[in-house]
Amino acid sequence: MFWLRGGAQSCRGGETEDRMQRGMWGVGLARRRLSTSLSALPAAARDFVEEAVRLCRPREVLLCDGSEEEGKELLRGLQDDGVLHPLPKYDNCWLARTDPRDVARVESKTVLVTPEQSDAVPPPPPSGGPPQLGNWMSPNAFQAAVQERFPGCMAGRPLYVIPFSMGPPTSPLAKLGVQVTDSPYVVLSMRIMTRVGPAVLQRLDDDFVRCLHSVGRPLPLTEPLVSSWPCDRSPVLVAHIPSERRIVSFGSGYGGNSLLGKKCFALRIASRMAQQQGWLAEHMLILGVTSPSGEKRYMAAAFPSACGKTNLAMMTPSLPGWRIHCVGDDIAWMKFDDEGRLRAINPERGFFGVAPGTSSRTNPNAMATIARNTIFTNVGLRSDGGVYWDGLDEPTEPGVTYTSWLGKPWKHGDPEPCAHPNSRFCAPADQCPIMDPRWDDPEGVPIDAIIFGGRRPRGVPLVVEAFGWRHGVFMGSAMRSEATAAAEHKGGRLMHDPFAMRPFFGYNAGRYLEHWLSTGLRSNARLPRLFHVNWFLRDNEGRFVWPGFGHNARVLAWIFGRIQGRDTARPTPIGWVPKEGDLDLGGLPGVDYSQLFPMEKGFWEEECRQLREYYGENFGADLPRDVMAELEGLEERVRKM
């Protein structure tokens, strides 16, 4: 981190001099003077930083270099300020507790800024209800919002400059960004989640995504912080300006709102870039599947947040001889190569995973990954220096006590959970014991199957293969899932989530579907097969009918066979499903094929009715005709059941 002076408003008044001297979110880092200045940045990046300095008026500017020394200083400063707490049970692991109001993505305050509303979102719902596929803000309203929030918002704090790469810097699919922020927690997390360092600075030119973030709590404070966590929740704004490749975030320190390389850049901005440039930026995991014979295939899978992407990407298969390797657990950038193969990279270099439910039983590889160099946020704390959350099956010694994510004593049986349902771990990807040897390959890996999925407690079979590309795009557009804790929606409500991108579209969702349809028309494309899975079917007593976790390898093995052209499927009105006996259920007592593949006419009649209503309400005239034709085809097949 290089020391820069000038252009910043000094802090004055309010807090004690001692508090200011100690740093308050890392101000103390400014005492280390290094030789390099903003001259290390190209002119466009310098202009961006200087613009942010004039607007936000920070105390000083610090250019991040990604060094180990820099990381240690950030950790020391955050520990001194009470933001991070060491976890001595593990190696270089830390706990952060946020303000209880700052715990998830804020979809209602996340906007796309375009001159024309139709560029960002489909027509407003005819019913007058809230839009489901994104929020639009006019350029004039955006400028007013910036002027209401940002002038002087970093007073008394340092402004950190983070040049970063999404994807291996040498990859033809890599994209660069520069984030400025007043949060050292964000700097530490971005060092894990993206590629930061000299290799990025060497490649940085005028073509980069501009990311401005502030927690919105200038010094001196006018009211005390909660959990030493700065945020200003009432005027939160997460804005994306696709035409300028710019992201502006204010008021939240939570990762989904502040780590701007993640959903903001890698999905919202990148999906618009992908549409313009002929590739795909998707909310998908990437994994490699190796059969007992040694043949390997790569698959991508789109699930809504907290629906099992990380567990699937890091799965330990229950089938002997099968192996899984992880390329990425959340985001895939995919582009056809000159031979027509769809190649994918993971643009991230870390995991920002949901902690609750993660255990040595459900995901032993994740547990191994997070045992060192990890930042935990809003998990419970054990008196032996370990962490705790619902579903963690680690034994504890007698006498060990617990502190909840709210900093209060907690015991088993208490009505409130010890860890927040959306508590997170942030860990380097290369610590995962099953990372694929090609996970960092600049050329990417070839994708042979794309899988859609969500939480559907009834009616939707365990696995279905699309009849073809167009039908598969329809399946992706028709995805529905129970809401999770990853956003501010209440869990349990069944929500439409096309392609698991509902919160992440970077442009009009109808045109997004058109882009997917046109992808299938490429003359030389070797298109992946498309599937839909549902691990979450329940019986009439509410019990899961599929054991999930490592047994999901049985479904992947069937998909593997379909990629090879095996005749193991039978047609149904909704797609191809495994023939009875062709999905390996050996050693699963009580698992009933008929329960895994329900085909109820009444359910699908209602599903079609609700889907037609949803399309009309949320896509309107922007729904591609081919998608409506697929719905009409499904309705006709269901009528004949």
Curated annotation (Swiss-Prot):
Listed binding positions for GDP are A306, C307, G308, K309, T310, N311, P356, R455, W535, F544, F549, N552
Enzyme class, one word? lyase
Biological process terms in GO annotation: cellular response to dexamethasone stimulus; cellular response to ethanol; cellular response to glucose stimulus; cellular response to insulin stimulus; egg-laying behavior; eggshell formation; embryo development ending in birth or egg hatching; embryonic organ morphogenesis
Tissue-level expression reads: Present in liver and kidney.
Record CDD domains: PEPCK_GTP (cd00819)
Q: Which reaction does it catalyse?
A: oxaloacetate + GTP = phosphoenolpyruvate + GDP + CO2
> Which residues hold Mn(2+)?
K263, H283, C307, D330
- Needed cofactors: Mn(2+)
- Tell me where the signal peptide lies: none
User: Might you give the EC number(s) for this enzyme?
Assistant: 4.1.1.32
Q: Where does the chain bind phosphoenolpyruvate? A: R105, G256, N422, R424
Transmembrane annotation, as ranges: none
Question: What cellular component terms from Gene Ontology apply here?
Answer: mitochondrial matrix; mitochondrion
Involved pathway(s): Carbohydrate biosynthesis; gluconeogenesis
Under the GO molecular function aspect, what terms does this record hold? GTP binding; manganese ion binding; phosphoenolpyruvate carboxykinase (GTP) activity
On induction, the UniProt comment says: Appears to be constitutively expressed.
Where is this protein found? Mitochondrion
Q: Which purpose does this protein serve, as stated in its record?
A: Catalyzes the conversion of oxaloacetate (OAA) to phosphoenolpyruvate (PEP), the rate-limiting step in the metabolic pathway that produces glucose from lactate and other precursors derived from the citric acid cycle. Facilitates the recycling of lactate carbon in the liver. Can play an active role in glyceroneogenesis and gluconeogenesis.
The text of the family note is: Belongs to the phosphoenolpyruvate carboxykinase [GTP] family.
Additional remark text: In eukaryotes there are two isozymes: a cytoplasmic one and a mitochondrial one. In birds, PEPCK-M is the sole form of hepatic PEPCK, but it constitutes 60% of the enzyme in the kidney.
Quaternary structure annotation from Swiss-Prot or TrEMBL: Monomer.
Q: What is this protein called?
A: Phosphoenolpyruvate carboxykinase [GTP], mitochondrial
Lineage at the top is:
Eukaryota, Metazoa, Chordata, Craniata, Vertebrata
